[in-house]
């Protein structure tokens, strides 16, 4: 499809057609973070996320004002960046955040972007789809140095072909995911998306996760529990009912539930309040 770039830029609050430079990449990542929430309502309601075409992603995240998970966020952003003149490679990763060292090897079910900026050396890791701990700035795809984002410091380490992204959270380095720099075709990403949106053991199928990152805070909703992380302090809010959770989804996170009107969203949310 011919990307409706203007529609996307309006969705994230930017005007005009920006130049494909590093400043634009930073601005788009920041605007996307604060404008399009992370959410898994489709898998939770039994709706597979199978189509990662530009048409499908634009229709859901822009036209219908929904959110999505990594394959959708980074899928849409990849198409946008290519339309602007950036060179984009899609990569796959394994989520290791909060996993025990001796846990089984996780599947490659995370999607990130490797982006080249015209006229600049090297490549940048871009990820607007890792929920409440997602990168809030592009960082150099370079192992070793600590790299400051709009929020926490991050760093990449490398072991053979594997890169590991870690974030400094409350003073400690937390590994988030590993990935290789081998580009992945869309069909491979659609297989991963199908798996995490339909497998009965997937946490996207069994629990509710919603997140958004503003300029000064990270908002993370898991079931009935909302955590707001801001300037080293965390506020915890516990909702009493599924109705209150849905109100937060609509009014705090800005998700339009109109395209789910034929489904009993409140009943399904009530089933997973404490998961």
Swiss-Prot record:
EC number(s) per UniProt? 2.3.1.5
Outcome following mutation: residue 127 to A/N/W:
Loss of activity
Q: What top-tier enzyme class does this entry carry? A: transferase
Q: Does the keyword Transferase apply?
A: yes
UniProt keywords (A-Z) are:
Acyltransferase, Transferase
Highest taxon above the source species:
Bacteria
| Claim: Cytoplasm is one of the keywords in the record | no
Matching InterPro entries, A to Z?
A: Arylamine_N-AcTrfase (IPR001447), Papain-like_cys_pep_sf (IPR038765)
Q: Which residues form a coiled coil?
A: none
Reaction catalysis annotation: an arylamine + acetyl-CoA = an N-acetylarylamine + CoA
**One of the record's GO molecular function terms:** arylamine N-acetyltransferase activity
Active site positions, chain numbering: 70 (acyl-thioester intermediate), 110, 127
| Job of this protein | Catalyzes the transfer of the acetyl group from acetyl coenzyme A to the free amino group of arylamines and hydrazines. Substrates include isoniazid, anisidine, and 4-aminoveratrole, and to a much lesser extent, p-aminobenzoic acid.
Question: What is stated as this protein's family in its record?
Answer: Belongs to the arylamine N-acetyltransferase family.
Subunit notes for this chain?
Answer: Homodimer and homotetramer.
Name-wise, this protein is Arylamine N-acetyltransferase
> Which lineage?
Bacteria, Bacillati, Actinomycetota, Actinomycetes, Mycobacteriales
């Amino acid at each position: 499809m011919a990307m409706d770039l203007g529609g996307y830029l309006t969705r994230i609050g930017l005007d005009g057609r920006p130049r494909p430079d590093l400043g634009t990449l930073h601005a788009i990542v920041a605007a996307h973070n604060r404008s399009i929430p992370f959410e898994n309502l489709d898998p939770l309601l039994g709706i597979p996320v199978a189509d990662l075409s530009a048409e499908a992603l634009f229709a859901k995240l822009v036209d219908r004002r929904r959110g999505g998970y990594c394959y959708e966020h980074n899928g849409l952003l990849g198409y946008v960046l290519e339309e602007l003149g950036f060179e984009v490679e899609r990569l796959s990763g394994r989520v290791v955040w909060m996993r025990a060292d001796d846990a089984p090897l996780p599947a490659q079910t995370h999607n990130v972007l490797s982006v080249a900026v015209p006229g600049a050396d090297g490549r940048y890791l871009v990820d607007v789809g890792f929920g409440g701990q997602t990168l809030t700035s592009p960082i150099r795809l370079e192992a070793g140095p600590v790299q400051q984002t709009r929020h926490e410091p991050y760093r990449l380490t490398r072991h053979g072909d594997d890169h590991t992204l870690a974030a400094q959270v409350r003073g400690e380095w937390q590994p988030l995911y590993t990935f290789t720099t081998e580009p992945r075709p869309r069909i491979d990403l659609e297989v991963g998306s199908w798996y995490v949106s339909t497998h009965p053991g997937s946490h996207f199928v069994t629990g509710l996760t919603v997140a958004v990152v503003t300029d000064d805070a990270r908002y993370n909703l898991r079931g009935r529990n909302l955590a707001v992380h801001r300037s080293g302090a965390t506020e915890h809010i516990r909702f009493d009912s599924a109705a209150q959770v849905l109100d937060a989804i609509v009014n705090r996170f800005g998700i339009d539930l109109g395209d789910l009107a034929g489904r009993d969203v409140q009943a399904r949310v009530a089933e997973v309040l404490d998961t």
